[in-house]
Structure formats: C-alpha cells, structure tokens
C-alpha cells in the first residue's frame, strides 16, 4: 500500500495488543479492506464476498487468511470461521454496511452486533477516508497513485449491554448503539483529517 498510495494512519495505538477484536470499517471503495490489512498493527481476517474469490485471487485471499462469505444466505461456514478467529484471539474485519456504498455507516446489518456479542470482542471503529474521492488517471477504478488515504482507528467499545442477552431485540439494540458510535467516529475522523471539505 505504501508503494502505491500515501496512507496516513491515526490512532493505531488504540487497537488492543492482544485478545479478540473486531474492526468495523466503512466501505466506499474496493481498496478499503486491503488498505486496512496493510496498515493495521495486527493481522486482520476480513469477511469478503465470495464473488471476490475468483481465479488466482481465490488461493491468494484464502492463503492470507481472508474469509469467503455468501451474502445471499446465512452462511454458517463463514460464521463459524469468523467466530473461530475471535476464539483464537484474532482480529476480525467487517464492513457492517454489508457492501460498498457511501461509506457513512448509514445502514448497518445485524451481523456486526452478533459477532461482537457472541464472540465477546470489543469493536474498534475504523474510518478509511480518501479512497473514493476521485478516480485515478491511469486506472479509473483506483484512487490516483501516490494520493493520500487516511485510516483512522477509534477507541474500542463493547457492543452488548452487559446482560449477555443474544435475542433479536438485544441484537437490534446493540446495532443501534454500534451505529451511533461508528457515526460519531466517522465525524471525528473527518475533523482530524480535514476531510469535511469533501462533503461539500
């Protein structure tokens, strides 16, 4: 990543050095996941749509510990592998919006809350800013080479309410709490990086 773009990493020291952790990452460009994997202080295993595992990318992504998920169904194999990452004290990366969008955490799925509550892992919000600002000159599908991309790690927090409940209502409530925390982190990240202007 450092050879292609100019990542500026803020708050990496906030990531717990050991134990299970979930990175909740906003998602507006295809390079967001690789960017976080490249700059994170700990190895990260992302849940990635199965459509990305094509050709030579399949053995490559699998070899570096990324997790294939079928988004059209409750993929029990992917769920089990993701929980396994947390059980082994690893870092699980999730795009809580479920797919690429505006990257503003406006619509979250319940999966993040499920993994956080079931896996007993704190959530670290991660904002990737600048990846979708403008297309590159040589490759339109990528940000301009050597352009700055900011990756801002936030304070870890617990998704549950302390009751240990895993009911649908409890997960819905946890999702609401998570969304507020992620949105607040994104706003703070924009202030820290001076990227408010990109919204105007």
Model-derived segments and spans:
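Proline-rich intrinsically disordered, low-complexity coils
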Residues: 7, 16, 20, 34, ...
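Non-catalytic C-terminal accessory region of glycerolipid acyltransferases
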Residues: 77-200
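N-terminal membrane-anchoring alpha-helices
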Residues: 1-6, 197-199
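A broad structural signal for alpha-helix termini and local helix breaks/kinks
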Residues: 3-5, 40, 119, 186
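Catalytic core of membrane glycerolipid acyltransferases/transacylases, capturing the structured
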Residues: 2-3, 10, 15-74, 81
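Generic structural signal for residues in well-ordered beta-strands
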Residues: 7-9, 151
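Short, conserved catalytic or adaptor-binding loops enriched in Gly and charged residues
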Residues: 1-2, 60-61, 143-144, 150
